[in-house]
């Protein structure tokens, strides 16, 4: 049988030679190297760690206390508190709105009650005010409708020379009361957002999000650092207004060998979604997969008078798997899996261009980026059925919003590029998508069937900024640029080979596959069909055996071997010898020794099924076909179909085939006229062999049978057998041969083009994916 190759690999996977061990040790050797980069970033200390820099999030951190600012006339932005810190008792703020005039004055402690004269908005006014408190200052809010007569509205009594106001929602908010019992009130001023405020004392700006901290200042005073003689108030008007340029290269710091450069770039991103559509074999009514795949795109655009050559790679993560199944007949329309971008997904766009910013992108910090939103609308895809009107998947929409940026590496056919990875978060929108002529309608997201929607590419504009440590000599390029590790190259080749492997599933002829599954494949015949390995079969086989040690199957064999040894020891030492059945029960799981009344049969059977594969290796029946035979035959067929494959990739591919081929398996044990069938997915059946009538599944009986009865791969499972019998009718002999997975009978049904048997074998082949 073809599964002989797996037996040989497992039997020899524990051998190793001394040279391999030496190579492994040398590959793991590391060295500590100390580098003194010099006084960068305006500090006298060497850098501790260079990483990808800041990662943007949707959280904005604002400065708590901004200032102090000198007296000035400004239009304060809404939702920012102005914290005033006057030195003398006088008018400290005034505002001239259309419907009302506003002013705030401060009185020092021990100020007698009486008429006070102030200049408010250019006019001399007189008002009766006073502050009899011995230690605290008093702030008065004054208001007037004509600008001549003012009246007191609110008062604030405080030991600190601090008061605050804020514009928000068309209102002017102020504080009143006696510290610490203070609260806010508000006045309504017309067009307050555009009203200029004359602030006649030093002041600070505090964001609304820090209101709690502001009230702490009002109650307890400013922190000591704000009262330092080294803090000098400045006019807001002296701030430089700087207009950013599309290309900026700014020297942050520099020494003889290295310098820090800040690169700011306005960029245009264009990208394409890639997709893969795999149609199942058979009559042409079934699709096995519609999925996204990475897609490269190269383009040029103009920036600041120069032509920029750019390269992008678009990939997705966190996609949602959907499926549609209209029935079990071979002519029923089925889409086993199609991927959809939704709100929990991510879109990654790796960007590189030929500018100076990417020349030495090795040590980077302070990385940030922002982009315009991208609207992506899906197109249509026709499911071309052999007969009848075609269903059509159409519609779908997401809007991609900029979410984060990190460093990355892009792979082209010739070189790997240090690049920036921009992460976008989709937000679903209209229109919805649907599959016409089905019940699949009013679904939201962007399906993988036609994500481009007729567009050649999607485009957005944005800007990124980063600070990079580069050589002071601009002609020198860091050696790591445009390089990649051997492991990265290997992973890329393995990824490409996986995709090619999975696409070959629909090209396998079933009758030839059965013949191949019956052949006693060994390691030499498995690998000798590859042109590039004809002269290196021995080395390839050795590498595969070494890699096989890490497979899940090899670990299961080792674990169960130890458990069997422990079980045998416990039997020999026990005072009363137990049956072999009880030993196997303990091996499988002590919880399987329960009564039929246990409501967790599915969990128990799935645990047993996961270990029956190992038992099948040791007790495979003569003449019966197993899942491992089909897996090995598919593996051999696909290897032969691939024109070129690197020998160093084969160990990973073959080891993955052992663990991942046909993930859903059913195993069968026959006891006289009753067949017991369990699946590693938790499904279980017990039925009569002659009539396929279901009976009660006896867990204890099944556990006893596991010990002495051979384990049979249920190539044709119970549901398929019942469907075959109901639609075509089969004899008792045919039924018994199918239960034993007799390859001759399977091939007869396939040659007769029996749609039910062919569909079952096709599904097994399609499960041979890595």
From Swiss-Prot:
Species annotation: Rotavirus A (isolate RVA/Cow/Germany/993/1983/G18P[17]) (RV-A)
InterPro entries assigned to the protein according to its UniProt record, in alphabetical order: ConA-like_dom_sf (IPR013320), Rota_A_VP4 (IPR042546), Rota_VP4_MID (IPR035330), Rota_VP4_MID_sf (IPR038017), VP4_concanavalin-like (IPR000416), VP4_helical (IPR035329)
One GO cellular component, as annotated: host cytoskeleton
Ranges in a coiled coil: 480-507
Motif KID motif positions after renumbering to this chain: 638-640
Motif (YGL motif): 444-446
Motif (DGE motif): 304-306
Top-level taxon of the source organism: Viruses
Protein name according to UniProt: Outer capsid protein VP4
Region (Spike head) location: 65-222
Keywords tagged on the record: Capsid protein, Coiled coil, Disulfide bond, Hemagglutinin, Host cell membrane, Host cytoplasm, Host cytoskeleton, Host endoplasmic reticulum, Host membrane, Host-virus interaction, Membrane, Outer capsid protein, Viral attachment to host cell, Viral penetration into host cytoplasm, Viral penetration via permeabilization of host membrane, Virion, Virus entry into host cell
Residues marked Cleavage (site): 229-230, 243-244
Sequence segments annotated as region (Spike body and stalk (antigen domain)): 244-475
Family classification: Belongs to the rotavirus VP4 family.
Miscellaneous remark of the record: In group A rotaviruses, VP4 defines the P serotype.
Region (Hydrophobic): 385-405
Annotated Pfam families: Rota_VP4_MID, VP4_haemagglut, VP4_helical
Cysteine pairings via disulfide bonds: 314-376
UniProt region (Spike foot), positions on chain: 506-770
Any GO BP annotation: virion attachment to host cell
